[in-house]
Every structure is written in C-alpha cells, then in structure tokens.
Amino acid sequence: MKPDAHQVKQFLLNLQDTICQQLTAVDGAEFVEDSWQRESGGGGRSRVLRNGGVFEQAGVNFSHVHGEAMPASATAHRPELAGRSFEAMGVSLVVHPHNPYVPTSHANVRFFIAEKPGAEPVWWFGGGFDLTPFYGFEEDAIHWHRTARDLCLPFGEDVYPRYKKWCDDYFYLKHRNEQRGIGGLFFDDLNTPDFDHCFAFMQAVGKGYTDAYLPIVERRKAMAYAERERNFQLYRRGRYVEFNLVWDRGTLFGLQTGGRTESILMSMPPLVRWEYDYQPKDGSPEAALSEFIKVRDWV
C-alpha cells in the first residue's frame, strides 16, 4: 500500500487524546491545550498538565509541519530529499511525577514523508519509549521491558533486542559515562517491508506506552517520601536536562530549524538542581541507582 499521511495523522491525533485521557484518569487534573500554527506550514497541539495529584508536569505534544523544501541542514545528510516537498508529524510526551519513587517516562512516535512529481515518495517511521527511575525496583523494570518485548513479538523475534539496544545506545550521557535510565525501545528510519507493516508497528509502540507505564505509576504513587528523596529526584532530573540539551537529536534539530521553542522544551522538568561533586552515601538507595541503570537484559 502507498504511504497514507492522512491516516497516520488521524492515528496520532487520536493517540494524543487517548494518552491525555489515561493520564488524567490517574491524576485527576486536566490538560490545558495550546494550539499553534507554523508560519512556513503546519502547526500542532501542545497539551500540559501541571501540579496535578500525581504528576508535577506532563506534556503531550502533537505536531504536523510541512513545506515545499527541506532545510539545507537536513538535505546535507540525505541528498535524495533535495527538491522534495515534505511532511513531518508526531506525538511526543514526557511525564515528570511528584513522587520520587515514580519514574519519569518519555515516548515518541513520528512519521516523515518527502515527495516530488514523477518519483516514488521517501518515507519512514520512528519512535520508542524509555523509563528514567530515581529509585530502582526490579519488578517495575521487568514489567516495562516485558511490555516492550511483547508488543514487538508479532513483528519478529529480533525486533525487541535490536530496538532495546538502540535505545540503550541512544539514551547515554557520554560526558557522564552513564545511561539516562533503563531504556526501552528506540527505532528510526523504519520503512521495510512496507507501509502497512511499519505503520502497524508504530501504532503498537504508541499504544504500548501506557500499558508499560501506568501500572508502575499506580504501584508507586502512594509511597511515602521525604526531603532526602525529593532532593535526589531533583538532582537526577539534572541528567535529564543535560541529555536533552547536549545529546538529543530531536531537541537540537528542532531548535536549529526554527521549531516552536516552547513545545520543544516542554520535556524539561519544572524543577531541577545541580550539586558540585555530589556523592551518595555508600550502601544507600541513592547509591544503588548507578548500578541499577547499567545496561542489562531485563527479560
């Protein structure tokens, strides 16, 4: 089947609605929507839930941008895109909970297509989801990765191990020599064997995110915590900021190509702290995190 951008867009709009409804059902607070237009073509819906019962901030973005020509920065790496009109669309979200025992989560699914008369379209899907705990619970990590593995299985035995490794490699802070979290799935440039297969996989990832995340939220959201845990959460959120501003390709591409800054930086935690040469106490739960987030096979 030939790529159907309209069908993908409808799925993404519905996915944004569904995820917002599911997060509101857990939290009790409503999302506030900010619709925006892009001067050179397209727009989006940014939705933010702030200071809820469970989530300190949750941002769920839909964007659909299009134009007559790709920016030079993009065609330099992909000369086959030169002279083509393009459409890029996706849903991207980050959830920062109040409770330090509830991990931060991130998910993204996206579609890109570039076309010109008389030529086959160039298209691909990308996306994934990843989890960033502050305190490690093995049962949570196993559930997260089991959900990821199970949604991948109908698409091939090798899909989960391949996209898990890609996720581990991608969400890595080189300047800290550590993982951002315990990973999950990451894929990009997916366009084989055909559109229907790739679209079905992207849908499975989009729908699988809340299956993976919400049971963990329910399990941890009522755990008692004090200032020590909160301070550690804010300190570890600093790693999230460092990754997004230094290493994340999507953030950098968006800022360099004149994307909507408020939407791009919606992934940032609302509060964060840095501390010079912080060393957790030996044997403490805080010290255990550095071992917990090291790459391993969870399932």
UniProtKB/Swiss-Prot annotation:
Gene3D superfamilies cross-referenced by the UniProt entry: Coproporphyrinogen III oxidase, aerobic (3.40.1500.10)
Domain of life where this protein originates: Bacteria
Main localization (coarse): cytoplasm
GO annotation terms (biological process): protoporphyrinogen IX biosynthetic process
PANTHER family recorded: COPROPORPHYRINOGEN III OXIDASE, MITOCHONDRIAL, OXYGEN-DEPENDENT COPROPORPHYRINOGEN-III OXIDASE, MITOCHONDRIAL
Family indicated by similarity: Belongs to the aerobic coproporphyrinogen-III oxidase family.
Name of the protein described by the UniProt record: Oxygen-dependent coproporphyrinogen-III oxidase
UniProt source species: Shigella dysenteriae serotype 1 (strain Sd197)
Gene giving rise to this polypeptide: hemF
